[in-house]
């Protein structure tokens, strides 16, 4: 399985946190009020050389406060690539397309978009569908990993079932596993993009060494025709509790 707070409430605070975490937390699936999977996409942002820090400051000063107030902007979680600090991958979760429209057309977002132009080299949006969006209701994660998997099409249904089960189990049972997010490309449903959020390095290593994780990986590894892992720079992801309706 596998993807800093850019503009919103529950995102990574490479650029500064907005919400305080509580040590007492429980696990939940992010859903709409009707119980449906929310709208999901990935934004891959590339800055000019050395420009990511400036882009973060711009986001924090423009669109960040607005995003925190938007009820339909559930989460903006991401990380900066440890191998290329000019690249950030951001998982965006919205209640609906209308919620995304409200976010992306707001005056604050337009101000952010205009101000970042001098340091923005490239932006790519990848439409996706959620498979598992599991997280604790509170917490601050310092370690983020992302993966891209290509699943053998005939194995996709079984992969989705096993992965959903393990994502829920890990977030529920493992104290240091704060979030497990699994998505499929909209136009290529066997291409999987994941994000894992851990409290710290120790929590990551403990999960990787656990019997449950080892068993899960033994089951799903034969289902992949390609795997790619992204390790992200250390940061602070402050979890959002938007999209959690059974608190």
Predicted regions and their residues:
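Bacterial N-terminal signal peptides that target proteins for export
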Residues: 1-11
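Acidic/histidine-rich, surface-exposed loop or edge segments in extracytoplasmic proteins
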Residues: 37-46
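Structural beta->alpha junctions
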Residues: 45-50, 94-95, 150-154, 198-199
């Amino acid at each position: 399985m596998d993807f800093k707070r850019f503009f919103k409430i529950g995102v990574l605070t490479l650029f500064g946190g907005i919400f305080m975490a509580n040590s007492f937390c429980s696990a939940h699936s992010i859903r709409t009020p009707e119980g449906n999977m929310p709208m999901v996409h990935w934004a891959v942002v590339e800055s000019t050389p050395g420009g990511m820090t400036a882009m973060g400051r711009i986001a924090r000063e423009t669109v960040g406060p607005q995003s925190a107030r938007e009820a339909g902007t559930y989460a903006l979680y991401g990380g900066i690539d440890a191998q290329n600090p000019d690249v950030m991958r951001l998982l965006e979760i919205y209640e609906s397309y209308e919620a995304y429209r409200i976010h992306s057309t707001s005056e604050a977002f337009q101000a952010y978009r205009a101000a970042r132009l001098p340091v923005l080299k490239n932006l790519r949006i990848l439409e996706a569908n959620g498979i598992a969006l599991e997280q604790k209701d509170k917490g601050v994660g310092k370690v983020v990993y992302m993966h891209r998997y290509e699943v053998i099409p005939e194995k996709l249904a079984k992969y989705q079932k096993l992965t959903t089960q393990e994502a829920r189990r890990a977030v529920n049972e493992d104290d240091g596993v704060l979030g497990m997010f699994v998505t499929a490309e909209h136009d290529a449903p066997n291409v999987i993009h994941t994000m894992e959020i851990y409290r710290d390095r120790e929590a990551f290593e403990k999960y990787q060494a656990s019997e449950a994780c080892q068993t899960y990986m033994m089951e799903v590894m034969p289902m992949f025709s390609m795997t790619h892992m992204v390790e992200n720079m250390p940061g602070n992801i402050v979890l959002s509790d938007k999209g959690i309706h059974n608190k």
